[in-house]
Amino acid sequence: LVMAGVESGRDGHIARNNNCVYVCFIEYTYIGTSRINCNDLCTKNGAKSGYCHQFSEYGNSCWCIDLPDNVPIKVPGDCHLQ
């Protein structure tokens, strides 16, 4: 079976390039000093939707549904702040 033009996506905690998640409170996270809704962050990055995943293994962090493969998600290992 060959499928042409179909993009795959995956669900996961959207991450910055340093493998750090976007920490959220209720539904919002911060990018710099700007407050953004997790759903907006996810959809602006090509996901179908997103929400603040409360009490996850990475704390409260934005979870995206059907995020494109070219957008980083949290992978096992440390968050590299430097």
Curated annotation (Swiss-Prot):
N-terminal signal peptide: 1-8
Disulfide topology: C20-C79, C24-C52, C38-C62, C42-C64
Cellular component GO terms held in the UniProt record: extracellular region
Main location: secreted
Keywords noted in UniProt: Disulfide bond, Ion channel impairing toxin, Neurotoxin, Secreted, Signal, Toxin, Voltage-gated sodium channel impairing toxin
Transmembrane segments: none
Keyword Signal on entry: yes
SUPFAM superfamilies: Scorpion toxin-like (SSF57095)
Domain of life according to the entry: Eukaryota
Record domain LCN-type CS-alpha/beta: where: 10-80
Pfam families to which the protein is assigned, alphabetical: Toxin_3 (PF00537)
Record localization: Secreted
Tissues expressing the protein: Expressed by the venom gland.
A single GO molecular function term of this UniProt record: toxin activity
Single Gene Ontology BP annotation: defense response
Biological role stated in the UniProt entry: Alpha toxins bind voltage-independently at site-3 of sodium channels (Nav) and inhibit the inactivation of the activated channels, thereby blocking neuronal transmission.
Family assignment from sequence similarity: Belongs to the long (4 C-C) scorpion toxin superfamily. Sodium channel inhibitor family. Alpha subfamily.
Record's comment describing the protein's domains: Has the structural arrangement of an alpha-helix connected to antiparallel beta-sheets by disulfide bonds (CS-alpha/beta).
Name of this protein: Sodium channel neurotoxin MeuNaTxalpha-3
